[in-house]
Amino acid sequence: MLMRMSTLFLRTLREDPVEAEVASHKLLVRAGYVRRAAPGIYTWLPLGLKVLRKVEQVVREEMDAAGAQEVHFPALLPREPYEATNRWSDYGDGIFKLKDRKGADYLLAPTHEEMFTLLVKDLYSSYKDLPLSIYQIQTKYRDEARPRAGIIRGREFTMKDSYSFDVDDAGLERSYELHRQAYVRIFERLGLDFVIVSAVSGAMGGSRSEEFLHPTAIGEDTFVRSPGGYAANAEAVTTLAPPAVPFDGLPAAHVEDTPDTPTIETLVAVSNEKHPRADRPWTAADTLKNVFVVLRHPDGTREPLAVGVPGDREVDPKRLEAAVSPAEVEAFEAADFAKHPALVKGYIGPGVLGTEGASGIRYLVDPRVVDGTAWITGADAEGRHVFDLVAGRDFTPDGFVEAAEVKAGDPAPDGSGPLELARGIEIAHIFALGRRFAQALDLKVLDENGKQVVVTMGSYGVGVTRALACVAEGNHDEKGLVWPRALAPADVHVVATGKDPEIFATAERLAGELVAQGLEVLYDDRPKVSPGVKFKDAELIGVPTILVVGKGLAEGLVELKDRRSGDSEQVALDDAVSRVATAVRG
């Protein structure tokens, strides 16, 4: 195929878009691959669409090889199936909802579990029909509160979602593993570094889920790994709780004056100065910090919540949100404090917390707050703290919550060594859903004994546009994009420079011969554009092989450039087509 830049719908830019923060966003816009239509919404231009289709084709080939079959669902979906699974409300403000002219409710699909389930229910009724895996590559919609980083986190995006249907859990495990291995092959073919980590299931539910993360400093997700092979999204890390301590011999709780201690740091300093202990100094880890939030439940009700964590750690909003899902976390405002006069701001302790406490506010604590652990915490009086307040003896929380931040050096939950922290972008997520959706939508089949059984399901997603952005993020230099050969919009970029008609005629002939060889050719045949601009555009667009026809033609030579290495050489005109074909095909 031949694309002529003189007629190609393309406009390159020399300056970065003002809203762009990351390299992939800047370069995909500047090189004319995408164009912003609205916050989090992008138009795909011809070059971008070619790369996107190549990513889709890799995904399609590996899904087909894994035995999955492609279908295509509408993006506009009715409310009723999502009501049956509670996700109409569980998604909260995260989905786009609309009404038709008759007042019926619809949503723009964030994902399609319900619709796939109903389709299989409509067509299949026997164990003989299973196992089944079906997939689609389709546009999805999420009402992101803060779309950012171009197509990495948008409101409209392309996703491959697939679903497996099995009679039993053993079948689900096989389907899950088939998808897992297919994803490994997909990302290897795309040339993407990735790590597979344990993850939380969130609104999807299910017994098991894993994320495929692309490690990068710009990633929004924090994940951990250990020398022994443990890997998890920070939201999924479980805390190794210390053993409970016997109450016998523990000192009694005592309240002390601690004036002017608005922070953990000042509290520790005053405690060591005015209330020192004999064995060792007080540290932030000896304090119990109580943080207040409001949970907004899917039915719209608001519930105040107190979270107690050791003072040397902050509450991680993402871990808290994962722990309380599907509720959403909101700030505890001044008006909320006013409704609870028992709360003395800055000095709140467990004494007034809990559903049985004076405030009536549910109180969840970090798993490290086990029975027998002693703490410095608020005494519910201005300028006073209580020392040696013992969990299980002096206060009893309503439960535990995984909300404290995970730190480098924390022990891995499986004992495989200290954790190290890294950042990454989620490019895929796989879920062993189990029977949640099938149960809610009454998807059953007859088993071998003629008994109706609920089908067990898996759900598997690849962020196609996000994967493309990650490829761009990891394949660029100061001049522009440098596409892996398998994804480049063309195999070779032919550049005709100068004004000599013979140069353009030769470049035209070479481009035609390369197309005849089965190669995709991007041909810069623009007659009134300077060589400098053409070279800058070629480097910005990022086709891996560049063939320059210019002043060397007088000596029977053309220039062959490797975009990634920057190496170039003069080759004989008669050898140019074969040399390009060799460079492309290896």
Curated annotation (Swiss-Prot):
Highest rank taxon of the organism = Bacteria
Q: Which GO terms describe its molecular function?
A: aminoacyl-tRNA deacylase activity; ATP binding; proline-tRNA ligase activity
Keyword ATP-binding attached: yes
Q: What's the chief localization of this chain?
A: cytoplasm
What EC number(s) does its UniProt record assign? Answer: 6.1.1.15
> Might you report a single GO cellular component term?
cytosol
Q: Which family does it belong to?
A: Belongs to the class-II aminoacyl-tRNA synthetase family. ProS type 1 subfamily.
Q: What does the record's free text say on domains?
A: Consists of three domains: the N-terminal catalytic domain, the editing domain and the C-terminal anticodon-binding domain.
**Quaternary structure?**
Homodimer.
Role according to the record: Catalyzes the attachment of proline to tRNA(Pro) in a two-step reaction: proline is first activated by ATP to form Pro-AMP and then transferred to the acceptor end of tRNA(Pro). As ProRS can inadvertently accommodate and process non-cognate amino acids such as alanine and cysteine, to avoid such errors it has two additional distinct editing activities against alanine. One activity is designated as 'pretransfer' editing and involves the tRNA(Pro)-independent hydrolysis of activated Ala-AMP.
Protein name (database record) = Proline--tRNA ligase
Q: Which organism is it from?
A: Kineococcus radiotolerans (strain ATCC BAA-149 / DSM 14245 / SRS30216)
Q: What is the lineage of its organism?
A: Bacteria, Bacillati, Actinomycetota, Actinomycetes, Kineosporiales
